[in-house]
A protein has these predicted regions:
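Flexible loop/turn connectors
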Residues: 143-249
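Short beta-strand elements in bilobed, periplasmic/extracellular small-molecule ligand-binding domains
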Residues: 2-14, 117-139
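Alpha-helix capping/helix-boundary segments
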Residues: 43-44, 104-105, 112, 163-165
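Short acidic capping loops at alpha-helix termini that bridge into adjacent secondary structure
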Residues: 95-96, 127-130, 179-184
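Alpha-helical recognition/docking segments in bacterial nutrient-uptake
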Residues: 1-87, 147, 152
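Short acidic/polar active-site loop segments enriched in Thr and Asp
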Residues: 34, 95-97, 155
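Hydrophobic alpha-helical segments within soluble ligand-binding/sensing domains
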Residues: 74-99, 114, 118, 138-147, ...
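An alpha-beta-alpha
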Residues: 83-123, 230-243
Length: 249
């Protein structure tokens, strides 16, 4: 949408060293960029601080900046998405639902974690420290948290990302558990691989094309001095084969 509208679009990889060497506004000015769609920043990245005071329009996909009219956030309604996942599992009879996440270093992962706790509370389902697990490394999630969930008799696991859900699915199978007969697994994002895991992954979809369009609309608004704060899309639960009714004991 941006190119047909007359914009030149560059895809620019950004690492931490680059952010330390040059502030966001300076980088944008030197390269004659009028705005940016920023993806994949962690809360500790230097430019996150820049986005709080920047005058150059920026639309962030996975972080929300408070108080700067030059920035906007686009994404799905994660509260809605987590509610869809929890209510779906509850209808299948699951009461012992765990939540597995990679490091809470990005705001979107913090939002999803909090959304899980709220959704569980709304359905009258208990959560404890033993029913949630967060680690930076995928391997640590599999070695530290997943076995604990299984030992505690969890019958379903919601994962913060599809890649994590796929790893959990494979690990459960290697430990002798059948998915979904013994344990149900739900992912988040609906990346292309989700439809081709074994079994195919039930997940919460965020439509990448619609997110791209939303990012363009938000950035266009900022460039025209329309101060958009958030632009949320509805979440959608994609039911596949990694979830089933609670196992009979």
């Amino acid at each position: 949408m941006a190119e047909p509208a007359g914009f030149d679009v560059d895809i620019v990889p950004v690492d931490v060293q680059m952010q330390r060497n040059q502030h966001y506004d300076v980088f944008m000015l030197e390269h004659d960029y009028v705005g940016a769609f920023a993806i994949g920043f962690s809360l500790n990245d230097p430019w996150i601080q820049d986005f709080k005071v920047s005058h150059t329009p920026a639309v962030l996909f996975d972080n929300y900046i408070i108080g700067n009219p030059s920035t906007a956030y686009v994404g799905i309604d994660n509260d809605e998405g987590m509610e869809l996942a929890v209510s779906y599992l509850a209808r299948l009879g699951h009461r012992k639902i765990a939540y597995l996440s990679s490091s809470l270093g990005s705001q979107i992962l913090q939002i999803r974690h909090a959304a899980f706790l709220r959704a569980m509370h709304q359905h009258g389902l208990n959560t404890t420290s033993s029913s949630t697990g967060c680690s930076y490394y995928l391997s640590e999630c599999m070695e530290k948290h997943l076995p604990r969930f299984l030992e505690k008799g969890m019958t379903a696991i919601i994962c913060s990302q599809d890649t994590l859900a796929n790893a959990a699915l494979i690990q459960c199978q290697q430990l002798g558990y059948k998915v979904p007969e013994d344990i149900s697994i739900i992912g988040f994002d609906d990346i292309p691989i989700a439809a081709y895991t074994s079994p195919p992954l039930t997940t919460v979809r965020q439509d990448r094309l619609e997110l791209g369009k939303s990012g363009f609309f938000a950035l266009s608004s900022l460039l025209n001095s329309i101060s958009i704060s958030t632009f949320l899309l509805h979440a959608q639960l994609i039911e596949r084969k990694s979830t089933g009714e609670v196992p009979v004991t």
